[in-house]
């Protein structure tokens, strides 16, 4: 992916659903991953919560967004909003 002249590494992008937007300029997203258990071969779902910087306060609960890793913005924020993939209905 390219943004202007910059190349963006896909390993730095996280796709997730917004679960909270109660903080100013910050949203919390849940990123789910699926892995196969090495011994039992069952697909296991793991999820993590990430705090994302939303400069314009444009995300609402239920939106699907892409977040990109960036420098630390606060104690817990290490990601910023890249783009909104799908708006909530």
Curated annotation (Swiss-Prot):
Species annotation: Leptospira borgpetersenii serovar Hardjo-bovis (strain JB197)
CDD domains linked: Ribosomal_uS17
Keywords: Ribonucleoprotein, Ribosomal protein, RNA-binding, rRNA-binding
Subunit structure comment from the entry: Part of the 30S ribosomal subunit.
Function: One of the primary rRNA binding proteins, it binds specifically to the 5'-end of 16S ribosomal RNA.
NCBIfam families per record: PRK05610.1 (NF004123), uS17_bact (TIGR03635)
Cysteines engaged in disulfide bonds, as pairs: none
Protein known as: Small ribosomal subunit protein uS17
């Amino acid at each position: 992916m390219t943004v202007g002249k910059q190349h963006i590494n896909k390993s730095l992008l996280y796709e997730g659903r917004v679960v909270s937007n109660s903080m100013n300029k910050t949203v919390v997203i849940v990123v789910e991953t699926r892995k196969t258990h090495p011994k039992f071969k069952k697909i296991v779902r793991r999820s993590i919560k990430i705090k994302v910087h939303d400069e314009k306060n444009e995300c609402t609960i239920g939106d699907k967004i892409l977040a990109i890793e960036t420098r630390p913005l606060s104690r817990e924020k290490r990601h910023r909003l890249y783009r909104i993939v799908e708006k909530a209905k």
